[in-house]
Protein backbone atom coordinates (compact mmCIF):
# COMPACT_ATOMS: atom_id res chain seq x y z
CA UNK A 1 0.00 0.00 0.00
CA UNK A 2 1.33 3.44 -0.88
CA UNK A 3 2.09 6.00 1.75
CA UNK A 4 -1.11 7.68 2.98
CA UNK A 5 -2.16 10.90 1.35
CA UNK A 6 -2.86 13.76 3.70
CA UNK A 7 -3.39 16.65 1.31
CA UNK A 8 -6.08 18.32 3.43
CA UNK A 9 -3.86 18.27 6.52
CA UNK A 10 -0.98 19.68 4.48
CA UNK A 11 -3.22 22.43 3.13
CA UNK A 12 -4.47 23.46 6.57
CA UNK A 13 -0.98 23.37 8.08
CA UNK A 14 0.27 25.57 5.25
CA UNK A 15 -2.57 28.06 5.75
CA UNK A 16 -1.75 28.28 9.45
CA UNK A 17 1.61 29.83 8.59
CA UNK A 18 0.05 32.87 6.92
CA UNK A 19 -3.07 35.01 6.90
CA UNK A 20 -5.19 34.25 3.87
CA UNK A 21 -8.81 33.82 2.80
CA UNK A 22 -8.88 30.60 4.83
CA UNK A 23 -7.75 32.48 7.93
CA UNK A 24 -10.54 35.02 7.72
CA UNK A 25 -13.13 32.40 6.81
CA UNK A 26 -12.29 30.53 10.02
CA UNK A 27 -11.82 33.67 12.14
CA UNK A 28 -15.33 33.72 13.74
CA UNK A 29 -14.82 30.14 14.93
CA UNK A 30 -11.41 31.13 16.27
CA UNK A 31 -13.00 33.82 18.41
CA UNK A 32 -15.34 31.22 19.91
CA UNK A 33 -12.51 28.71 20.44
CA UNK A 34 -10.36 31.35 22.14
CA UNK A 35 -13.21 32.36 24.45
CA UNK A 36 -13.85 28.75 25.47
CA UNK A 37 -10.13 28.17 26.10
CA UNK A 38 -9.90 31.24 28.34
CA UNK A 39 -13.05 30.35 30.29
CA UNK A 40 -11.83 26.79 30.81
CA UNK A 41 -8.45 27.86 32.14
CA UNK A 42 -10.01 30.53 34.35
CA UNK A 43 -12.49 27.98 35.70
CA UNK A 44 -9.70 25.70 36.87
CA UNK A 45 -7.83 28.64 38.38
CA UNK A 46 -10.94 29.62 40.35
CA UNK A 47 -11.71 26.08 41.50
CA UNK A 48 -14.91 25.72 39.49
CA UNK A 49 -13.62 22.42 38.14
CA UNK A 50 -11.75 19.72 40.04
CA UNK A 51 -7.97 19.72 40.05
CA UNK A 52 -5.56 17.56 42.01
CA UNK A 53 -2.40 18.57 43.83
CA UNK A 54 0.09 15.70 43.84
CA UNK A 55 2.63 14.93 46.58
CA UNK A 56 5.57 16.05 44.44
CA UNK A 57 6.63 18.88 42.15
CA UNK A 58 4.99 18.66 38.71
CA UNK A 59 6.87 19.88 35.63
CA UNK A 60 4.71 20.23 32.50
CA UNK A 61 6.13 20.18 28.97
CA UNK A 62 3.58 21.16 26.34
CA UNK A 63 2.47 23.32 23.42
CA UNK A 64 0.13 26.20 22.82
CA UNK A 65 0.27 25.14 19.16
CA UNK A 66 -1.00 22.09 17.30
CA UNK A 67 1.67 19.71 16.04
CA UNK A 68 5.06 18.46 17.11
CA UNK A 69 7.66 20.80 18.52
CA UNK A 70 10.09 18.34 20.07
CA UNK A 71 8.37 17.65 23.40
CA UNK A 72 9.44 14.01 23.56
CA UNK A 73 13.20 14.65 23.28
CA UNK A 74 12.79 17.54 25.74
CA UNK A 75 11.15 15.22 28.29
CA UNK A 76 13.95 12.69 27.79
CA UNK A 77 16.61 15.36 28.33
CA UNK A 78 14.87 16.70 31.45
CA UNK A 79 14.48 13.18 32.88
CA UNK A 80 18.22 12.61 32.49
CA UNK A 81 19.06 16.02 33.98
CA UNK A 82 16.83 15.55 37.03
CA UNK A 83 18.20 12.06 37.65
CA UNK A 84 21.75 13.41 37.41
CA UNK A 85 20.79 16.00 40.03
CA UNK A 86 19.98 13.18 42.46
CA UNK A 87 16.19 13.30 42.00
CA UNK A 88 13.92 10.39 41.08
CA UNK A 89 11.73 11.54 38.19
CA UNK A 90 8.74 9.75 36.74
CA UNK A 91 6.98 10.48 33.45
CA UNK A 92 3.25 10.43 32.77
CA UNK A 93 1.75 10.74 29.30
CA UNK A 94 -1.66 10.40 27.73
CA UNK A 95 -0.80 7.50 25.41
CA UNK A 96 -1.97 9.15 22.20
CA UNK A 97 -4.01 6.95 19.88
CA UNK A 98 -4.16 4.04 22.33
CA UNK A 99 -7.30 2.73 24.03
CA UNK A 100 -6.58 2.34 27.74
CA UNK A 101 -9.02 1.16 30.40
CA UNK A 102 -6.65 1.78 33.29
CA UNK A 103 -3.24 3.34 33.98
CA UNK A 104 -0.52 1.27 32.39
CA UNK A 105 3.19 1.06 32.98
CA UNK A 106 5.37 1.46 29.89
CA UNK A 107 8.33 -0.90 29.77
CA UNK A 108 11.16 -0.94 27.22
CA UNK A 109 9.67 -4.23 25.99
CA UNK A 110 6.15 -2.79 25.56
CA UNK A 111 4.51 -2.45 22.15
CA UNK A 112 3.74 0.95 20.67
CA UNK A 113 0.23 -0.23 19.76
CA UNK A 114 -0.45 -0.83 23.48
CA UNK A 115 1.11 2.26 25.07
CA UNK A 116 1.83 4.81 22.32
CA UNK A 117 4.97 5.52 20.34
CA UNK A 118 6.25 8.53 22.29
CA UNK A 119 5.89 7.01 25.79
CA UNK A 120 7.65 3.88 24.54
CA UNK A 121 10.51 5.96 23.15
CA UNK A 122 10.82 7.76 26.50
CA UNK A 123 10.84 4.46 28.40
CA UNK A 124 13.63 3.13 26.20
CA UNK A 125 15.72 6.31 26.24
CA UNK A 126 15.38 7.30 29.91
CA UNK A 127 15.79 4.89 32.82
CA UNK A 128 12.77 6.25 34.72
CA UNK A 129 9.22 5.01 35.37
CA UNK A 130 6.84 5.88 32.51
CA UNK A 131 3.07 5.44 32.77
CA UNK A 132 0.18 6.27 30.44
CA UNK A 133 -3.51 7.10 30.86
CA UNK A 134 -5.70 10.04 29.74
CA UNK A 135 -6.45 11.01 33.37
CA UNK A 136 -2.94 12.05 34.34
CA UNK A 137 -3.74 12.56 38.06
CA UNK A 138 -5.12 9.02 38.27
CA UNK A 139 -2.15 7.73 36.30
CA UNK A 140 0.39 9.40 38.57
CA UNK A 141 -1.16 7.96 41.70
CA UNK A 142 -1.07 4.48 40.11
CA UNK A 143 2.59 5.02 39.29
CA UNK A 144 3.32 5.93 42.91
CA UNK A 145 1.87 2.62 44.09
CA UNK A 146 4.51 0.77 42.07
CA UNK A 147 7.23 3.42 42.31
CA UNK A 148 6.87 5.15 45.70
CA UNK A 149 10.36 6.63 45.40
CA UNK A 150 9.41 8.98 42.56
CA UNK A 151 9.72 12.54 43.86
CA UNK A 152 9.27 14.72 40.77
CA UNK A 153 6.82 14.30 37.89
CA UNK A 154 7.38 15.16 34.24
CA UNK A 155 4.03 15.58 32.50
CA UNK A 156 4.46 14.94 28.78
CA UNK A 157 2.16 17.08 26.61
CA UNK A 158 -0.08 18.11 29.49
CA UNK A 159 -0.22 21.89 29.23
CA UNK A 160 -4.01 21.96 28.78
CA UNK A 161 -4.60 19.11 31.26
CA UNK A 162 -5.68 21.42 34.10
CA UNK A 163 -7.08 18.56 36.17
CA UNK A 164 -3.52 18.23 37.42
CA UNK A 165 -1.97 21.18 39.23
CA UNK A 166 1.59 22.05 38.31
CA UNK A 167 4.61 23.81 39.72
CA UNK A 168 6.44 24.68 36.50
CA UNK A 169 5.19 25.03 32.94
CA UNK A 170 7.40 24.82 29.86
CA UNK A 171 5.83 25.93 26.58
CA UNK A 172 7.64 24.61 23.51
CA UNK A 173 7.98 26.04 20.02
CA UNK A 174 10.02 25.11 16.98
CA UNK A 175 11.11 27.27 14.05
CA UNK A 176 7.46 27.79 13.04
CA UNK A 177 6.81 29.54 16.36
CA UNK A 178 3.11 30.51 16.54
CA UNK A 179 2.41 30.42 12.82
CA UNK A 180 -0.03 33.17 11.88
CA UNK A 181 -0.72 33.87 15.54
CA UNK A 182 -4.40 32.92 15.39
CA UNK A 183 -6.45 30.45 17.39
CA UNK A 184 -7.88 27.21 16.01
CA UNK A 185 -9.23 26.66 13.41
CA UNK A 186 -7.90 29.80 11.67
CA UNK A 187 -4.42 29.19 13.06
CA UNK A 188 -2.41 26.61 14.99
CA UNK A 189 -2.94 28.02 18.50
CA UNK A 190 -4.71 26.04 21.23
CA UNK A 191 -4.21 28.96 23.60
CA UNK A 192 -3.01 32.55 23.04
CA UNK A 193 0.69 33.22 22.54
CA UNK A 194 0.44 35.55 25.54
CA UNK A 195 -0.54 32.68 27.84
CA UNK A 196 1.53 32.87 31.06
CA UNK A 197 4.23 30.24 31.52
CA UNK A 198 7.35 29.73 33.59
CA UNK A 199 9.64 29.12 30.63
CA UNK A 200 9.63 29.07 26.85
CA UNK A 201 11.75 26.42 25.14
CA UNK A 202 12.52 26.86 21.44
CA UNK A 203 13.61 23.82 19.45
CA UNK A 204 15.86 25.59 16.96
CA UNK A 205 19.59 24.94 16.42
CA UNK A 206 20.07 28.60 15.53
CA UNK A 207 18.36 30.03 18.61
CA UNK A 208 20.48 32.20 20.88
CA UNK A 209 19.32 33.35 24.31
CA UNK A 210 19.34 37.10 25.00
CA UNK A 211 19.40 38.98 28.34
CA UNK A 212 16.16 40.81 27.54
CA UNK A 213 14.27 37.49 27.49
CA UNK A 214 15.50 35.69 30.62
CA UNK A 215 12.84 32.96 30.57
CA UNK A 216 13.34 31.93 26.94
CA UNK A 217 15.69 29.00 26.35
CA UNK A 218 16.93 26.97 23.41
CA UNK A 219 17.12 23.29 22.54
CA UNK A 220 18.90 21.62 19.67
CA UNK A 221 18.81 18.02 18.45
CA UNK A 222 22.21 16.59 17.58
CA UNK A 223 22.32 13.62 15.22
CA UNK A 224 23.93 10.50 16.65
CA UNK A 225 25.27 7.51 14.77
CA UNK A 226 22.62 5.71 12.75
CA UNK A 227 21.94 2.06 13.53
CA UNK A 228 20.48 -0.68 11.41
CA UNK A 229 16.90 -1.58 12.29
CA UNK A 230 17.45 -5.33 11.81
CA UNK A 231 20.82 -5.37 13.59
CA UNK A 232 21.27 -2.54 16.14
CA UNK A 233 24.90 -3.57 16.66
CA UNK A 234 25.59 -2.14 13.19
CA UNK A 235 26.10 1.62 13.35
CA UNK A 236 27.77 4.40 11.39
CA UNK A 237 27.80 8.16 10.96
CA UNK A 238 25.00 9.36 8.68
CA UNK A 239 27.58 11.12 6.51
CA UNK A 240 28.57 7.63 5.27
CA UNK A 241 25.34 7.63 3.27
CA UNK A 242 26.19 10.82 1.36
CA UNK A 243 26.99 8.93 -1.86
CA UNK A 244 23.95 6.63 -1.57
CA UNK A 245 20.42 6.95 -2.88
CA UNK A 246 18.67 7.85 0.37
CA UNK A 247 15.00 8.03 1.28
CA UNK A 248 14.17 9.81 4.54
CA UNK A 249 10.78 9.00 6.05
CA UNK A 250 9.23 10.53 9.16
CA UNK A 251 5.86 10.14 10.88
CA UNK A 252 6.39 12.98 13.35
CA UNK A 253 4.68 16.31 13.96
CA UNK A 254 7.05 18.28 11.73
CA UNK A 255 8.84 15.88 9.33
CA UNK A 256 10.74 18.69 7.64
CA UNK A 257 12.77 19.18 10.82
CA UNK A 258 14.16 15.65 10.42
CA UNK A 259 14.79 16.09 6.71
CA UNK A 260 16.59 19.40 7.27
CA UNK A 261 18.90 17.85 9.85
CA UNK A 262 19.94 15.20 7.31
CA UNK A 263 20.64 17.85 4.69
CA UNK A 264 22.79 19.71 7.20
CA UNK A 265 24.74 16.47 7.66
CA UNK A 266 25.56 16.45 3.95
CA UNK A 267 22.83 14.17 2.59
CA UNK A 268 20.43 14.90 -0.28
CA UNK A 269 17.57 12.52 0.52
CA UNK A 270 14.29 11.96 -1.22
CA UNK A 271 11.64 12.56 1.43
CA UNK A 272 8.50 10.77 2.55
CA UNK A 273 6.53 12.77 5.14
CA UNK A 274 3.97 10.64 6.97
CA UNK A 275 1.16 11.67 9.34
CA UNK A 276 2.18 12.15 12.96
CA UNK A 277 1.93 8.87 14.92
CA UNK A 278 1.67 6.88 11.67
CA UNK A 279 1.23 3.27 12.81
CA UNK A 280 3.11 1.45 9.99
CA UNK A 281 0.44 -1.26 9.90
CA UNK A 282 0.68 -0.77 6.14
CA UNK A 283 4.24 -0.67 4.78
CA UNK A 284 4.71 2.83 3.29
CA UNK A 285 7.82 1.65 1.44
CA UNK A 286 6.24 -1.32 -0.36
CA UNK A 287 5.32 0.46 -3.60
CA UNK A 288 6.75 3.93 -3.11
CA UNK A 289 8.98 4.67 -6.14
CA UNK A 290 11.64 6.49 -4.13
CA UNK A 291 11.73 3.66 -1.58
CA UNK A 292 12.05 1.00 -4.27
CA UNK A 293 15.04 2.83 -5.76
CA UNK A 294 16.70 3.70 -2.45
CA UNK A 295 19.93 2.15 -1.22
CA UNK A 296 19.19 3.38 2.30
CA UNK A 297 15.98 4.32 4.13
CA UNK A 298 16.43 6.59 7.15
CA UNK A 299 13.74 6.83 9.84
CA UNK A 300 13.36 8.46 13.25
CA UNK A 301 13.56 6.74 16.64
CA UNK A 302 9.87 7.46 17.17
CA UNK A 303 9.00 5.56 14.01
CA UNK A 304 11.49 2.78 14.74
CA UNK A 305 9.46 1.50 17.71
CA UNK A 306 6.66 0.67 15.23
CA UNK A 307 8.85 -0.83 12.48
CA UNK A 308 10.46 -3.71 14.34
CA UNK A 309 8.63 -6.30 12.23
CA UNK A 310 10.12 -4.94 8.98
CA UNK A 311 12.77 -7.24 7.51
CA UNK A 312 14.64 -4.72 5.38
CA UNK A 313 18.39 -4.21 5.88
CA UNK A 314 18.15 -0.88 4.08
CA UNK A 315 16.30 0.71 7.00
CA UNK A 316 18.51 2.65 9.40
CA UNK A 317 17.40 4.57 12.48
CA UNK A 318 18.78 8.06 13.09
CA UNK A 319 18.72 8.88 16.82
CA UNK A 320 19.17 12.36 18.22
CA UNK A 321 20.56 13.74 21.46
CA UNK A 322 18.59 16.72 22.82
CA UNK A 323 20.71 19.52 24.26
CA UNK A 324 18.87 22.06 26.44
CA UNK A 325 20.23 25.37 27.72
CA UNK A 326 21.71 24.82 31.17
CA UNK A 327 19.85 27.85 32.50
CA UNK A 328 16.50 26.08 32.15
CA UNK A 329 17.78 22.99 33.94
CA UNK A 330 19.06 25.14 36.81
CA UNK A 331 15.75 26.98 37.08
CA UNK A 332 13.79 23.73 37.26
CA UNK A 333 16.13 22.37 39.92
CA UNK A 334 15.52 25.46 42.06
CA UNK A 335 11.75 25.09 41.73
CA UNK A 336 11.89 21.40 42.62
CA UNK A 337 14.14 22.00 45.61
CA UNK A 338 11.91 24.83 46.85
CA UNK A 339 8.90 22.57 47.23
CA UNK A 340 8.77 19.95 49.97
CA UNK A 341 8.18 16.66 48.14
CA UNK A 342 7.19 14.76 51.28
CA UNK A 343 3.47 15.55 51.14
CA UNK A 344 1.68 12.36 52.15
CA UNK A 345 -1.69 12.79 50.44
CA UNK A 346 -2.85 14.58 47.28
CA UNK A 347 -4.87 17.72 48.00
CA UNK A 348 -7.80 18.37 45.69
CA UNK A 349 -9.54 21.66 45.04
CA UNK A 350 -12.80 22.26 43.22
CA UNK A 351 -15.70 19.88 42.95
CA UNK A 352 -14.28 16.41 43.55
CA UNK A 353 -11.16 14.37 44.24
CA UNK A 354 -9.04 11.60 42.75
CA UNK A 355 -7.68 10.62 46.16
CA UNK A 356 -8.18 6.96 46.96
CA UNK A 357 -7.63 5.87 43.36
CA UNK A 358 -4.90 3.43 44.31
CA UNK A 359 -7.32 1.52 46.54
CA UNK A 360 -9.61 1.05 43.56
CA UNK A 361 -6.97 -0.63 41.42
CA UNK A 362 -6.48 -4.35 41.60
CA UNK A 363 -2.97 -5.64 42.15
CA UNK A 364 -2.26 -6.44 38.53
CA UNK A 365 -3.13 -2.88 37.47
CA UNK A 366 -1.10 -1.36 40.30
CA UNK A 367 2.12 -2.96 39.15
CA UNK A 368 1.47 -2.22 35.51
CA UNK A 369 0.26 -5.67 34.51
CA UNK A 370 -0.72 -7.12 32.24
CA UNK A 371 2.53 -5.91 30.76
CA UNK A 372 2.17 -4.08 27.51
Swiss-Prot record:
Ranges of compositional bias, category Basic and acidic residues: 360-372
Protein encoded by which gene: lpxK
Keyword Kinase in record: yes
Protein known as: Tetraacyldisaccharide 4'-kinase
Reactions this protein catalyses: a lipid A disaccharide + ATP = a lipid IVA + ADP + H(+)
Taxonomic lineage from the root: Bacteria, Pseudomonadati, Pseudomonadota, Betaproteobacteria, Burkholderiales
The protein's Enzyme Commission number: 2.7.1.130
Record-linked SUPFAM superfamilies: P-loop containing nucleoside triphosphate hydrolases
GO MF terms, alphabetically ordered: ATP binding; tetraacyldisaccharide 4'-kinase activity
Pathway listed: Glycolipid biosynthesis; lipid IV(A) biosynthesis; lipid IV(A) from (3R)-3-hydroxytetradecanoyl-[acyl-carrier-protein] and UDP-N-acetyl-alpha-D-glucosamine: step 6/6
Sequence similarity: Belongs to the LpxK family.
One cellular component term from this protein's GO annotations in UniProt: plasma membrane
Biological processes, Gene Ontology terms: lipid A biosynthetic process; lipopolysaccharide core region biosynthetic process
Key words of the record: ATP-binding, Kinase, Lipid A biosynthesis, Lipid biosynthesis, Lipid metabolism, Nucleotide-binding, Transferase
Binding site for ATP: 65-72
Residue segments, region Disordered: 351-372
Organism of this sequence: Cupriavidus metallidurans (strain ATCC 43123 / DSM 2839 / NBRC 102507 / CH34) (Ralstonia metallidurans)
Biological function: Transfers the gamma-phosphate of ATP to the 4'-position of a tetraacyldisaccharide 1-phosphate intermediate (termed DS-1-P) to form tetraacyldisaccharide 1,4'-bis-phosphate (lipid IVA).
Amino acid sequence: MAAPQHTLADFVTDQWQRRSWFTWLMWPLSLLFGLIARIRRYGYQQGWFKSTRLPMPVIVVGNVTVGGTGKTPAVIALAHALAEAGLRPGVVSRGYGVKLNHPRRVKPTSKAADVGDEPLLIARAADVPVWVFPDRALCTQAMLVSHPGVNVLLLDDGLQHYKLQRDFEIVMFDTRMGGNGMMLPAGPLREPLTRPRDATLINDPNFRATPDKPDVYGMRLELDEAWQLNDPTMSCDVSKFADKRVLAAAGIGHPERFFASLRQAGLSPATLPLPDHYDFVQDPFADNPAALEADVILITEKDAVKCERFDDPRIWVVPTTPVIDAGLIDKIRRVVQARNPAIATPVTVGQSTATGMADGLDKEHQDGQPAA
